[in-house]
Amino acid sequence: MRIGIITLWQSNDNYGQQLQCWALQQALLKLGHEPYLIRYDIDGRINNTKKPLWKKILKVVLLYPLIKKLIRIKKDKVEKGLISYNATKNKERRFDEFRNVNIIQSDTVFKNLKELQDNPPQADAYIVGSDQVWAHLLSNYENRAMFLDFGDAKVKRIAYAPSFSMQLYPIGLRQELVDNLSRFNSLSVREKSGGNICKKHGFDVSVVVDPTMLLTKEDYNVLQSNEKHTKYLFLYYLNISNPEDIEWNELKRIAHKEGLKVIATPASGYFPGRELFDGVEYQYATINQWINLIESAEIVATTSFHGVVFCILHHTPFIYFPLSGKYSRGNNRVVDLCQDLSLSGQIWHPKASLEEMMNNDINWADVDLKLKNMRNESQNFLYNSLI
Protein backbone atom coordinates (compact mmCIF):
# COMPACT_ATOMS: atom_id res chain seq x y z
CA MET A 1 0.00 0.00 0.00
CA ARG A 2 1.32 3.43 -0.95
CA ILE A 3 1.11 5.72 2.09
CA GLY A 4 1.59 9.49 2.16
CA ILE A 5 2.68 10.87 5.54
CA ILE A 6 2.18 14.48 6.54
CA THR A 7 4.11 15.69 9.57
CA LEU A 8 6.64 18.26 10.72
CA TRP A 9 9.90 17.85 8.80
CA GLN A 10 11.65 21.16 8.09
CA SER A 11 13.69 21.73 11.24
CA ASN A 12 17.44 21.95 10.88
CA ASP A 13 18.18 21.39 14.55
CA ASN A 14 15.35 19.40 16.17
CA TYR A 15 16.56 15.80 16.26
CA GLY A 16 13.32 14.29 17.51
CA GLN A 17 11.34 15.81 14.66
CA GLN A 18 13.55 14.18 12.05
CA LEU A 19 13.78 10.83 13.81
CA GLN A 20 10.02 10.45 14.35
CA CYS A 21 9.59 11.03 10.62
CA TRP A 22 12.24 8.45 9.77
CA ALA A 23 10.99 5.94 12.34
CA LEU A 24 7.40 5.92 11.10
CA GLN A 25 8.61 5.23 7.58
CA GLN A 26 10.75 2.37 8.86
CA ALA A 27 7.84 0.87 10.79
CA LEU A 28 5.65 1.00 7.69
CA LEU A 29 8.37 -0.49 5.50
CA LYS A 30 8.58 -3.41 7.93
CA LEU A 31 4.86 -3.97 7.37
CA GLY A 32 5.47 -4.17 3.62
CA HIS A 33 4.09 -0.75 2.68
CA GLU A 34 5.50 2.04 0.51
CA PRO A 35 5.57 5.16 2.68
CA TYR A 36 6.74 8.61 1.69
CA LEU A 37 6.81 12.06 3.27
CA ILE A 38 4.37 14.59 1.82
CA ARG A 39 6.50 17.72 1.83
CA TYR A 40 3.99 20.28 3.05
CA ASP A 41 5.58 23.65 3.76
CA ILE A 42 3.73 24.36 7.00
CA ASP A 43 6.48 26.72 8.16
CA GLY A 44 6.35 28.81 4.99
CA ARG A 45 10.10 28.51 4.50
CA ILE A 46 10.07 27.85 0.78
CA ASN A 47 9.81 30.95 -1.43
CA ASN A 48 8.64 32.87 1.65
CA THR A 49 5.04 31.82 1.11
CA LYS A 50 4.08 32.91 4.62
CA LYS A 51 5.05 36.06 6.46
CA PRO A 52 7.21 35.20 9.50
CA LEU A 53 5.52 35.65 12.85
CA TRP A 54 8.05 38.24 13.97
CA LYS A 55 7.10 40.44 11.00
CA LYS A 56 3.40 40.17 11.82
CA ILE A 57 4.11 41.14 15.41
CA LEU A 58 6.33 44.01 14.30
CA LYS A 59 3.58 45.36 12.06
CA VAL A 60 1.21 45.56 15.02
CA VAL A 61 3.83 47.12 17.27
CA LEU A 62 4.41 49.94 14.78
CA LEU A 63 0.97 51.24 15.67
CA TYR A 64 2.03 51.72 19.29
CA PRO A 65 4.03 54.61 20.78
CA LEU A 66 7.64 55.08 19.78
CA ILE A 67 9.10 53.53 22.93
CA LYS A 68 7.28 50.24 22.33
CA LYS A 69 8.38 50.36 18.74
CA LEU A 70 12.03 50.67 19.72
CA ILE A 71 11.80 47.86 22.27
CA ARG A 72 10.21 45.55 19.75
CA ILE A 73 12.72 46.38 17.03
CA LYS A 74 15.58 45.69 19.40
CA LYS A 75 14.05 42.36 20.42
CA ASP A 76 13.51 41.37 16.80
CA LYS A 77 17.10 42.30 16.00
CA VAL A 78 18.38 40.03 18.77
CA GLU A 79 16.15 37.16 17.65
CA LYS A 80 17.10 37.57 13.99
CA GLY A 81 20.76 37.61 14.99
CA LEU A 82 20.25 34.38 16.91
CA ILE A 83 18.47 32.78 13.98
CA SER A 84 21.31 33.84 11.67
CA TYR A 85 23.92 32.40 14.06
CA ASN A 86 21.97 29.15 14.36
CA ALA A 87 21.66 28.88 10.59
CA THR A 88 25.44 28.95 10.35
CA LYS A 89 25.96 26.39 13.12
CA ASN A 90 23.17 24.17 11.81
CA LYS A 91 25.18 23.43 8.69
CA GLU A 92 27.32 21.23 10.92
CA ARG A 93 24.25 19.14 11.79
CA ARG A 94 23.63 18.27 8.10
CA PHE A 95 19.91 17.67 8.48
CA ASP A 96 19.28 18.30 4.78
CA GLU A 97 21.70 15.51 3.97
CA PHE A 98 19.97 13.19 6.45
CA ARG A 99 16.57 13.86 4.90
CA ASN A 100 17.81 13.40 1.35
CA VAL A 101 19.56 10.12 2.15
CA ASN A 102 17.23 8.54 4.69
CA ILE A 103 13.69 9.85 4.23
CA ILE A 104 11.57 8.97 1.20
CA GLN A 105 9.98 12.23 0.05
CA SER A 106 7.44 13.53 -2.44
CA ASP A 107 8.93 15.21 -5.49
CA THR A 108 6.55 18.13 -5.02
CA VAL A 109 6.72 20.61 -2.18
CA PHE A 110 3.17 21.74 -1.40
CA LYS A 111 3.25 25.37 -0.32
CA ASN A 112 -0.32 25.63 0.95
CA LEU A 113 -3.54 23.71 1.49
CA LYS A 114 -4.96 24.73 -1.90
CA GLU A 115 -2.03 23.09 -3.68
CA LEU A 116 -2.68 19.88 -1.72
CA GLN A 117 -6.35 20.00 -2.65
CA ASP A 118 -5.84 20.90 -6.31
CA ASN A 119 -3.09 18.36 -6.91
CA PRO A 120 -3.37 15.81 -4.08
CA PRO A 121 -0.44 13.45 -3.50
CA GLN A 122 -1.27 9.99 -4.78
CA ALA A 123 -1.68 7.33 -2.11
CA ASP A 124 -3.86 4.48 -0.91
CA ALA A 125 -3.74 5.92 2.60
CA TYR A 126 -2.72 9.15 4.29
CA ILE A 127 -1.22 9.31 7.76
CA VAL A 128 -0.81 12.43 9.86
CA GLY A 129 1.70 12.28 12.69
CA SER A 130 3.54 12.19 14.82
CA ASP A 131 4.80 15.28 16.68
CA GLN A 132 2.83 18.39 17.66
CA VAL A 133 0.93 18.64 14.37
CA TRP A 134 -2.41 19.30 16.10
CA ALA A 135 -0.98 22.12 18.19
CA HIS A 136 -1.47 24.17 15.00
CA LEU A 137 -4.98 25.48 15.67
CA LEU A 138 -7.85 25.24 13.21
CA SER A 139 -8.40 29.00 13.49
CA ASN A 140 -5.86 29.05 10.65
CA TYR A 141 -7.53 27.45 7.63
CA GLU A 142 -4.17 26.20 6.34
CA ASN A 143 -3.88 23.88 9.34
CA ARG A 144 -6.70 21.72 7.99
CA ALA A 145 -3.89 20.09 6.02
CA MET A 146 -2.83 18.44 9.28
CA PHE A 147 -6.32 16.97 9.47
CA LEU A 148 -5.94 15.53 5.96
CA ASP A 149 -8.45 17.84 4.28
CA PHE A 150 -7.29 16.93 0.78
CA GLY A 151 -7.37 14.01 -1.63
CA ASP A 152 -10.04 11.56 -2.69
CA ALA A 153 -12.59 10.65 -0.03
CA LYS A 154 -11.88 6.96 -0.70
CA VAL A 155 -8.29 7.26 0.56
CA LYS A 156 -7.91 5.91 4.10
CA ARG A 157 -7.07 8.58 6.65
CA ILE A 158 -5.17 7.64 9.78
CA ALA A 159 -3.87 9.69 12.68
CA TYR A 160 -0.77 8.10 14.19
CA ALA A 161 0.37 9.65 17.49
CA PRO A 162 -0.29 13.33 16.76
CA SER A 163 -0.03 15.67 19.72
CA PHE A 164 -2.34 18.56 20.60
CA SER A 165 0.15 19.87 23.17
CA MET A 166 -2.75 21.20 25.26
CA GLN A 167 -5.23 19.95 27.85
CA LEU A 168 -8.36 21.49 26.31
CA TYR A 169 -9.16 22.57 22.76
CA PRO A 170 -10.29 26.22 22.48
CA ILE A 171 -14.06 26.46 22.98
CA GLY A 172 -14.63 28.53 19.85
CA LEU A 173 -12.93 25.92 17.66
CA ARG A 174 -14.54 22.76 18.99
CA GLN A 175 -17.06 22.33 16.17
CA GLU A 176 -14.20 22.81 13.70
CA LEU A 177 -12.33 20.07 15.54
CA VAL A 178 -15.29 17.69 15.41
CA ASP A 179 -15.75 18.31 11.68
CA ASN A 180 -12.09 17.60 10.99
CA LEU A 181 -11.75 14.54 13.22
CA SER A 182 -14.80 13.05 11.48
CA ARG A 183 -12.67 12.68 8.38
CA PHE A 184 -10.52 9.89 9.87
CA ASN A 185 -10.93 6.14 9.50
CA SER A 186 -8.58 5.44 12.44
CA LEU A 187 -7.65 7.79 15.28
CA SER A 188 -4.77 7.64 17.72
CA VAL A 189 -2.88 10.24 19.74
CA ARG A 190 0.43 10.30 21.59
CA GLU A 191 -0.69 11.67 24.97
CA LYS A 192 -3.52 10.81 27.32
CA SER A 193 -4.52 14.48 27.34
CA GLY A 194 -5.03 14.27 23.58
CA GLY A 195 -7.09 11.13 24.06
CA ASN A 196 -9.30 13.00 26.52
CA ILE A 197 -9.83 15.81 24.00
CA CYS A 198 -10.98 13.36 21.32
CA LYS A 199 -13.20 11.36 23.69
CA LYS A 200 -14.80 14.53 25.03
CA HIS A 201 -15.92 15.27 21.48
CA GLY A 202 -17.31 11.79 20.88
CA PHE A 203 -14.44 9.96 19.17
CA ASP A 204 -12.93 6.57 19.95
CA VAL A 205 -9.18 6.94 20.10
CA SER A 206 -6.11 4.88 20.96
CA VAL A 207 -3.11 6.23 22.83
CA VAL A 208 0.02 4.95 21.09
CA VAL A 209 3.77 5.37 21.41
CA ASP A 210 5.76 7.95 19.50
CA PRO A 211 7.03 6.49 16.18
CA THR A 212 10.59 6.51 17.52
CA MET A 213 9.50 3.85 20.02
CA LEU A 214 8.00 1.58 17.37
CA LEU A 215 11.62 0.64 16.70
CA THR A 216 14.19 -0.99 18.96
CA LYS A 217 17.70 0.13 19.78
CA GLU A 218 19.00 -2.31 17.16
CA ASP A 219 16.92 -0.64 14.44
CA TYR A 220 18.90 2.55 14.99
CA ASN A 221 22.27 0.86 14.49
CA VAL A 222 22.16 1.84 10.82
CA LEU A 223 22.31 5.47 11.94
CA GLN A 224 24.99 5.09 14.58
CA SER A 225 28.37 6.78 14.47
CA ASN A 226 31.28 5.23 16.34
CA GLU A 227 32.96 8.28 17.82
CA LYS A 228 34.54 7.88 21.25
CA HIS A 229 34.72 10.46 24.04
CA THR A 230 36.13 10.56 27.54
CA LYS A 231 33.44 10.15 30.20
CA TYR A 232 30.84 12.88 29.91
CA LEU A 233 27.44 14.19 30.87
CA PHE A 234 25.39 14.99 27.78
CA LEU A 235 23.21 18.08 27.99
CA TYR A 236 20.55 18.18 25.27
CA TYR A 237 18.18 21.07 25.71
CA LEU A 238 15.55 23.23 24.07
CA ASN A 239 12.78 25.59 25.18
CA ILE A 240 14.77 27.17 28.03
CA SER A 241 16.34 30.61 28.21
CA ASN A 242 18.12 30.54 31.58
CA PRO A 243 20.82 28.14 32.84
CA GLU A 244 19.03 27.77 36.15
CA ASP A 245 16.01 26.31 34.37
CA ILE A 246 17.97 23.07 34.69
CA GLU A 247 19.71 23.77 38.02
CA TRP A 248 22.94 24.37 36.12
CA ASN A 249 25.21 25.32 39.02
CA GLU A 250 24.36 22.14 40.91
CA LEU A 251 24.55 20.01 37.77
CA LYS A 252 27.96 21.45 36.93
CA ARG A 253 29.21 20.84 40.48
CA ILE A 254 28.18 17.19 40.40
CA ALA A 255 29.69 16.64 36.94
CA HIS A 256 33.00 18.09 38.17
CA LYS A 257 32.88 15.94 41.30
CA GLU A 258 32.30 12.80 39.20
CA GLY A 259 35.05 13.71 36.74
CA LEU A 260 32.67 14.16 33.83
CA LYS A 261 33.11 16.72 31.12
CA VAL A 262 29.89 18.25 29.81
CA ILE A 263 28.96 18.07 26.14
CA ALA A 264 26.02 20.29 25.21
CA THR A 265 23.78 20.36 22.15
CA PRO A 266 21.11 23.08 21.88
CA ALA A 267 18.04 22.79 19.68
CA SER A 268 15.03 24.88 18.71
CA GLY A 269 11.49 24.20 19.81
CA TYR A 270 9.04 26.89 20.85
CA PHE A 271 11.82 29.43 20.22
CA PRO A 272 15.34 29.36 18.72
CA GLY A 273 18.01 27.38 20.54
CA ARG A 274 20.97 29.20 22.06
CA GLU A 275 24.25 28.61 23.86
CA LEU A 276 23.51 29.17 27.56
CA PHE A 277 26.15 27.36 29.58
CA ASP A 278 29.72 28.13 30.57
CA GLY A 279 32.51 25.58 30.68
CA VAL A 280 30.92 23.07 28.32
CA GLU A 281 31.88 21.61 24.95
CA TYR A 282 29.23 22.56 22.41
CA GLN A 283 28.62 20.05 19.66
CA TYR A 284 26.31 20.70 16.73
CA ALA A 285 26.00 16.99 16.08
CA THR A 286 24.65 15.22 13.04
CA ILE A 287 21.69 12.95 13.77
CA ASN A 288 23.98 9.92 13.76
CA GLN A 289 26.36 11.63 16.19
CA TRP A 290 23.48 12.73 18.41
CA ILE A 291 22.28 9.14 18.85
CA ASN A 292 25.83 8.12 19.72
CA LEU A 293 26.16 10.98 22.22
CA ILE A 294 23.11 9.69 24.07
CA GLU A 295 24.10 6.03 23.95
CA SER A 296 27.66 6.64 25.18
CA ALA A 297 26.91 9.21 27.91
CA GLU A 298 27.28 8.41 31.59
CA ILE A 299 24.07 10.37 32.08
CA VAL A 300 21.89 12.73 30.05
CA ALA A 301 20.28 15.93 31.35
CA THR A 302 17.52 17.08 29.03
CA THR A 303 14.38 19.16 28.56
CA SER A 304 13.43 17.12 25.50
CA PHE A 305 10.82 14.39 25.09
CA HIS A 306 12.84 12.68 22.38
CA GLY A 307 15.96 13.09 24.47
CA VAL A 308 14.19 10.97 27.10
CA VAL A 309 12.98 8.48 24.49
CA PHE A 310 16.46 7.74 23.18
CA CYS A 311 17.85 7.44 26.70
CA ILE A 312 15.21 4.79 27.37
CA LEU A 313 15.96 2.93 24.14
CA HIS A 314 19.70 2.91 24.91
CA HIS A 315 19.45 2.33 28.68
CA THR A 316 21.21 5.61 29.42
CA PRO A 317 20.44 7.14 32.83
CA PHE A 318 18.74 10.53 32.47
CA ILE A 319 17.22 13.45 34.30
CA TYR A 320 14.33 15.29 32.71
CA PHE A 321 13.89 18.94 33.65
CA PRO A 322 10.24 19.98 33.15
CA LEU A 323 9.46 23.16 31.26
CA SER A 324 7.80 25.98 33.15
CA GLY A 325 5.30 28.75 32.49
CA LYS A 326 3.44 28.78 29.19
CA TYR A 327 5.65 26.00 27.82
CA SER A 328 4.76 23.57 30.61
CA ARG A 329 2.12 22.03 28.34
CA GLY A 330 5.02 20.22 26.68
CA ASN A 331 5.64 18.19 29.83
CA ASN A 332 2.56 15.96 29.46
CA ARG A 333 4.18 13.64 26.96
CA VAL A 334 7.20 13.02 29.20
CA VAL A 335 5.12 12.62 32.36
CA ASP A 336 2.83 10.09 30.62
CA LEU A 337 5.74 8.10 29.26
CA CYS A 338 7.69 8.01 32.52
CA GLN A 339 4.59 7.01 34.48
CA ASP A 340 3.86 4.18 32.05
CA LEU A 341 7.45 2.90 32.36
CA SER A 342 7.85 3.47 36.12
CA LEU A 343 10.47 6.15 35.50
CA SER A 344 8.81 9.09 37.24
CA GLY A 345 11.79 9.23 39.59
CA GLN A 346 13.85 10.62 36.71
CA ILE A 347 11.73 13.78 36.47
CA TRP A 348 13.27 16.61 38.46
CA HIS A 349 11.24 18.60 40.99
CA PRO A 350 12.29 21.32 43.47
CA LYS A 351 12.54 18.92 46.42
CA ALA A 352 14.63 16.39 44.51
CA SER A 353 18.35 15.80 45.00
CA LEU A 354 20.14 15.83 41.65
CA GLU A 355 22.94 13.75 43.07
CA GLU A 356 20.54 11.05 44.24
CA MET A 357 18.69 11.13 40.93
CA MET A 358 21.94 10.62 39.05
CA ASN A 359 22.55 7.49 41.10
CA ASN A 360 19.06 6.00 40.82
CA ASP A 361 19.16 2.29 40.06
CA ILE A 362 16.91 1.93 37.01
CA ASN A 363 15.42 -1.51 36.40
CA TRP A 364 15.94 -1.58 32.65
CA ALA A 365 14.57 -5.12 32.30
CA ASP A 366 11.24 -3.96 33.74
CA VAL A 367 11.29 -0.87 31.50
CA ASP A 368 11.97 -2.99 28.43
CA LEU A 369 9.09 -5.35 29.22
CA LYS A 370 6.60 -2.52 29.66
CA LEU A 371 7.85 -0.76 26.54
CA LYS A 372 7.59 -3.98 24.53
CA ASN A 373 3.92 -4.29 25.46
CA MET A 374 3.26 -0.66 24.56
CA ARG A 375 5.12 -1.09 21.28
CA ASN A 376 3.15 -4.22 20.38
CA GLU A 377 -0.18 -2.49 21.01
CA SER A 378 0.88 0.47 18.87
CA GLN A 379 2.14 -1.75 16.06
CA ASN A 380 -1.19 -3.59 16.13
CA PHE A 381 -3.05 -0.29 15.81
CA LEU A 382 -0.96 0.64 12.80
CA TYR A 383 -1.35 -2.79 11.19
CA ASN A 384 -5.12 -2.95 11.72
CA SER A 385 -5.62 0.60 10.47
CA LEU A 386 -4.09 -0.34 7.13
CA ILE A 387 -5.95 -3.59 6.50
Sequence positions of predicted segments:
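Active-site anion-handling motifs in enzyme catalytic cores
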Residues: 1-387
